[in-house]
């Protein structure tokens, strides 16, 4: 009976340890995927309508896909 109790305790400790480790890995994987998915390419931003192409009217640099607004037009350089 003692051996069975010890065996059950060891099994419970191992299972809880595995659950803790698995939970930590899931959080790290989510953080890593969020880090890589935050920034979009110029083409993706343009395709989704989040920025303006070359020679389009603009007021701010952030409106242009290429990141430059001069004389109220998006420019590439």
Curated annotation (Swiss-Prot):
GO molecular function: ion channel inhibitor activity; toxin activity
Disulphide bonds in the chain: 51-65, 58-69, 64-74
Pfam families: Conotoxin
Any one cellular-component term (Gene Ontology): extracellular region
Organism: Conus striatus
Similarity field: Belongs to the conotoxin O2 superfamily.
Higher taxonomy: Eukaryota, Metazoa, Spiralia, Lophotrochozoa, Mollusca
Coiled coil region boundaries: none
Domain topic, free-text comment: The presence of a 'disulfide through disulfide knot' structurally defines this protein as a knottin.
Statement: the UniProt record of this protein carries the keyword Protein biosynthesis: no
Signal peptide residue numbers: 1-19
Protein's recorded name: Conotoxin S6.11
Cellular localization per UniProt: Secreted
Propeptide residues according to the Swiss-Prot or TrEMBL record: 20-50
Main location: secreted
Keywords: Disulfide bond, Knottin, Secreted, Signal, Toxin
Tissues/organs with expression: Expressed by the venom duct.
């Amino acid at each position: 009976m003692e051996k069975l109790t010890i065996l059950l305790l060891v099994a419970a400790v191992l299972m809880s340890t595995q659950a803790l480790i698995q939970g930590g890995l899931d959080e790290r994987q989510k953080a890593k995927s969020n880090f890589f998915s935050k920034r979009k390419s110029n083409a993706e931003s343009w395709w989704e309508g989040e920025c303006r192409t070359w020679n389009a009217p603009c007021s701010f640099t952030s409106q242009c896909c290429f990141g430059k607004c001069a004389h109220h037009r998006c420019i590439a350089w």
